[in-house]
């Protein structure tokens, strides 16, 4: 697989997220959060099961389509679950609820890495001489097919588990949400035009765009940074990357606790400024000091996605579902900032210099946390007495 084909994996994933966020919001605006979540789970299960025929026919495009379906399902789930958790309860603690729920996301990532390592990756790494020998003997295609077929069982099991979750959600009675009760009547169900009257929401979409760019960019090039400046082998660098997921998880659970004592926006602002300092160290002091500095940014970025989401949705009322979809669409930042970092790396031959991109992203997030996130609700027009 060449670099262009590898890049299509990221494209398929982010396009799935981006393109299905608005349809997800429209479905949920008409039928409610529960329907949207069930559709998301059914799409996920379908996407997982599509890996079976994709592996059998050995077509790269088929794998991309399956991945696109899974990404689209995640768009449904994010567009539904995040706003639902945000409005389910006291608005003053929406950031805590969302951080707690999102804390299980990296746990799933870690579990996925473990499952992939055990059940998908065979651990067999062929050197060029061995590959040439297999090709000469006409056995290389059989070897590739055998390796590819290893994805079938894990993805089939995953698909079945997700379908089971869909059944559980279908049979679960959801609590009544105020905005859905209003939507069921004659009250307006929200519109895109209305959303632009909320500056904290518009800036929240931008903040999420910058955050995803910083997160994906940092993690995408972390192994390159480690290898360039410490000369560790790729496998050991991979362990460091897994470690970032661990500290990311710890950070979310700890942030949920700290929000009992510190305002979420203030805490995010402090964390953002800490990351500005840490990334600056990574830029100016590449090496072991820079490595640990960039490593620790995962801890301090952990609260940003759910906190930005909750802050951006505050006070949107019937516009919450559509607003949530636009914040989900901001994940496209990962597909934009990562190539920018790559171009900087190619131009300067310095991964440390490319880290300036996430540094700038954290500066904007700090601004949003301290200033832009203050909810300013649109004021109704005053009647003029005559």
Can you annotate each of these PLM segments?
Residues 8-29, 242-254, 333:
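Central cavity-lining transmembrane alpha-helices of secondary-active solute carriers
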Residues 42-57, 273-287:
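C-terminal ends and interior cores of transmembrane alpha-helices
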Residues 59-77, 289-304:
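Hydrophobic core of transmembrane alpha-helices in multi-pass small-molecule transporters
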Residues 76-90, 302-317:
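Intracellular juxtamembrane helix-capping segments at the cytosolic ends
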Residues 96-125, 325-338:
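Glycine-rich segments within core transmembrane alpha-helices of 12-TM secondary carriers
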Residues 112-121, 193-242:
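Extracytoplasmic gate region of multi-pass secondary transporters
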Residues 262-308:
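C-terminal transmembrane helical hairpin of 12-TM major facilitator-type secondary transporters
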